[in-house]
Amino acid sequence: MPRSRINGNFIDKTFSIVANILLRIIPTTSGEREAFTYYRDGMSAQSEGNYAEALQNYYEAMRLEMDPYDRSYILYNIGLIHTSNGEHTKALEYYFRALERNPFLPQALNNMAVICHYRGEQAIRQGDSEIAEAWFDQAAEYWKQAIALTPGNYIEAQNWLKITRRFE
């Protein structure tokens, strides 16, 4: 039974109902419908913290989905799971892949900046200020790109950029 039929969350149920209606009225191929079902089930599992199940659904959606824009969101969500699991190198890889398909994903750029900033803080704790500065500089570049795409967002990042004199 698809996950969307067993989920008890009201918002997920509402999303599933609306998505099913749209899939019936918008012309789509059976492959597109199947890819979306896996994507939707992946989001549902992810929201419940069932990351292994979410990844299985996302990988299956990737196998079926051909549209680069839609694939970018699948890749982004896979990156989120790896970030949550502390697998930052894998997460960065998936965020990069998402951005290759859709360069207008400020949330991917923000998450990449957060990972770089975290690595900079780790380097400081290890006493390596040179490496820390390199990570902070990289974080700044990603945040600047995210802010350029959505100027009203990422206020904390904007403040950090100003405080550290990295804002242009």
UniProtKB/Swiss-Prot annotation:
Biological function: Essential for the assembly of the photosystem I (PSI) complex. May act as a chaperone-like factor to guide the assembly of the PSI subunits.
SMART domains recorded: TPR
Gene3D superfamilies, per database record: Tetratricopeptide repeat domain
Name of the protein described by the UniProt record: Photosystem I assembly protein Ycf3
Compartments in which it is found: Plastid, Chloroplast thylakoid membrane
This protein's UniProt keywords: Chloroplast, Membrane, Photosynthesis, Plastid, Repeat, Thylakoid, TPR repeat
Record-linked InterPro entries: PSI_Ycf3_assembly, TPR-like_helical_dom_sf, TPR_rpt, Ycf3/AcsC/BcsC/TPR_MFPF
Start and stop residues of the TPR repeats: 35-68, 72-105, 120-153
Topology within the bilayer: Peripheral membrane protein
UniProt entry tagged with the keyword Membrane: yes
Species this protein is from: Pelargonium hortorum
PROSITE patterns: TPR, TPR_REGION
Family: Belongs to the Ycf3 family.
Pfam family, any one: TPR_1
Record keyword Plastid present: yes
Record-linked SUPFAM superfamilies: TPR-like
GO biological process, any: photosynthesis
GO cellular component, one term: chloroplast thylakoid membrane
